Amino acid sequence: MSEKTTKFIKTIGVLAQNEYNARKKAILPSVCIAQAALESGWNLAAKSLFGIKGNGFKATTSEFYNGHYVQIEDTFRAYPNVAAAVVGYYDFLEKTPRYAGALNNSNYKDTVDKLIHTTDGAPYATDPNYISKIISIIEQYNLTIWDNKECGNQKSIEELADEV
């Protein structure tokens, strides 16, 4: 694993686990890390780690509509730093009713599925391969070690960071 990838996982992992442990309803840290990696291209300097649309900055993005990818310009939320982006991501998911099914799951595959198959049919992402991409990142980098609240792992965040 590259130094850049290790740093990314440790940085997002610590922040995600802090948010996960502090909230009553939250998404698994492994899913948070994988989404940040996919949406930002493993870039901690990205203004929008999670690709959440909203007021912030305009960028070109690919969306999948009517059976094919199209390039569109859209506006994304921007955050001043990585910590604020992670808090913003957890706030967004917690406050958006369509993602309620993705919160407090102990299984990352079910969690990712519920981000796409939402209660109102508006998925987190339009990419038909989004679920498999997120699951692949989680499994390739063993990101479930960050989900210790659910799996009973009593290791500290620092111990987990050392395992990456």
Spell out what each predicted region is:
Residues M1-E163:
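Catalytic cores of secreted/periplasmic lytic hydrolases that degrade extracellular macromolecules
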